[in-house]
Amino acid sequence: MAALVALHGVVRRPLLRGLLQEVRCLERSYASKPTLNEVVIVSAIRTPIGSFLGSLASQPATKLGTAAIQGAIEKAGIPKEEVKEVYMGNVIQGGEGQAPTRQATLGAGLPISTPCTTVNKVCASGMKAIMMASQSLMCGHQDVMVAGGMESMSNVPYVMSRGATPYGGVKLEDLIVKDGLTDVYNKIHMGNCAENTAKKMNISRQEQDTYALSSYTRSKEAWDAGKFASEITPITISVKGKPDVVVKEDEEYKRVDFSKVPKLKTVFQKENGTITAANASTLNDGAAALVLMTAEAAQRLNVKPLARIAAFADAAVDPIDFPLAPAYAVPKVLKYAGLKKEDIAMWEVNEAFSVVVLANIKMLEIDPQKVNIHGGAVSLGHPIGMSGARIVVHMAHALKPGEFGLASICNGGGGASALLIEKL
């Protein structure tokens, strides 16, 4: 080592110079342990959720994303120039044009120099965008970021295969089904996977219907009590020759007839099936965004955080068992955070299907009264690229100071993401 020290400043031969740099790097890595920055949520905003071909159908995902990003930055009270990078989840991108997150970001008036990335982890996309942004902030690559998710299922196109047009016409495929809702490994719909879970976990049609009705009831009560007011940014829609229409409330939860729910036919499995249009989530439009930053940046910008990112994790299982995947991600998060199930004040388990929540409550042995307390995707709607971010947004507002909330969401292919926050 003394000989190497003596060479400092006088080494000209490339081999020795490279060796010296390697030794310096080794010295530094052994001498110091890197510390991660604390990441906080400064604002958390979402658009209302529109029904399929409903109130927001005229707005592409990128426009909804623009509204969410703009709303989150305004709520944070920081200059747009402070946002160093943007990640947004978006699943079915066909027909949206290049780089959807870039479109949403520039539409929100952020500087042209802002890097943008679109994340696709199917239904977990919005949550994964938050996790990836948190990692960048923790490591010090950036100090202020926006992350969230967006989807307009009303605007997803039909496609046809390229090539010569065959005799007899062409077959159009619905990209909602092909790219969003089909298990490519077993070549079955997500709903058939959910039916498999219902059978495996012994969860009846009646249990699922009861849960679905509870979701609708909780959503209505939450809206009536103003539980969503602080997280919504209204969407103004221009209508030719008519006054502008302002959408400021979720559309889906009002569209239910409780008396018809038990009478509906099953959708995916005709004989001995359990899943219906009522106890599954719907196709929807919406976007959500959060302003994330390091605790140091929050201090520098003199902003008060809503919550801190405490831990997060992904998990994966057999693709057909995707509804059960959250039950494997959640224990990882609790372990990383050093917490027990009993420490969690509020759980969000995305309601892709009612059976998903019922199965995960059963596997995790958690209190149903603490799960999706203000309803979920069955009643509010499930814009697939948005939902993972939406449940984090809601927790950031619904928790009380000092409480922990844990959100989890399954995704096609057998995956899940889970994220823990602490309200500040």
UniProtKB/Swiss-Prot annotation:
Enzyme class, spelled out: transferase
N6-succinyllysine modification, residue list: 63, 75, 171, 178, 187, 199, 220, 227, 240, 242, 260, 263, 265
Location of the active site: 123 (acyl-thioester intermediate), 410 (proton donor/acceptor)
Free-text activity regulation comment from the record: Activated by potassium ions, but not sodium ions.
Keyword vocabulary terms for this entry: Acetylation, Acyltransferase, Fatty acid metabolism, Lipid metabolism, Metal-binding, Mitochondrion, Phosphoprotein, Potassium, Transferase, Transit peptide
Enzyme Commission (EC) number: 2.3.1.9
UniProt entry tagged with the keyword Ribosomal protein: no
Keyword Transmembrane helix: no
InterPro entries: Thiolase, Thiolase-like, Thiolase_acyl_enz_int_AS, Thiolase_AS, Thiolase_C, Thiolase_CS, Thiolase_N
Matches recorded under Gene3D superfamilies: 3.40.47.10
One GO location term (cellular component): mitochondrion
Classification via PROSITE patterns: THIOLASE_1 (PS00098), THIOLASE_2 (PS00737), THIOLASE_3 (PS00099)
Gene Ontology biological-process annotations: acetyl-CoA biosynthetic process; acetyl-CoA catabolic process; adipose tissue development; coenzyme A biosynthetic process; fatty acid beta-oxidation; isoleucine catabolic process; ketone body catabolic process; liver development
GO molecular function: acetyl-CoA C-acetyltransferase activity; cholesterol O-acyltransferase activity; coenzyme A binding; enzyme binding; identical protein binding; potassium ion binding
N6-acetyllysine PTM sites in chain numbering: 63, 171, 178, 187, 199, 220, 227, 242, 248, 254, 260, 270, 335
Pathway listed: Lipid metabolism; fatty acid beta-oxidation
SUPFAM superfamilies according to UniProt: Thiolase-like
Catalytic activity entry: 2 acetyl-CoA = acetoacetyl-CoA + CoA; propanoyl-CoA + acetyl-CoA = 2-methyl-3-oxobutanoyl-CoA + CoA
Pfam families according to UniProt: Thiolase_C (PF02803), Thiolase_N (PF00108)
Record: transit peptide: 1-30
Modification sites for Phosphoserine: 204
Function according to Swiss-Prot or TrEMBL: This is one of the enzymes that catalyzes the last step of the mitochondrial beta-oxidation pathway, an aerobic process breaking down fatty acids into acetyl-CoA. Using free coenzyme A/CoA, catalyzes the thiolytic cleavage of medium- to long-chain 3-oxoacyl-CoAs into acetyl-CoA and a fatty acyl-CoA shortened by two carbon atoms. The activity of the enzyme is reversible and it can also catalyze the condensation of two acetyl-CoA molecules into acetoacetyl-CoA. Thereby, it plays a major role in ketone body metabolism.
Similarity-based family: Belongs to the thiolase-like superfamily. Thiolase family.
Subunit structure: Homotetramer.
UniProt name for this protein: Acetyl-CoA acetyltransferase, mitochondrial
UniProt organism field: Mus musculus (Mouse)
Encoding gene, per UniProt annotation: Acat1
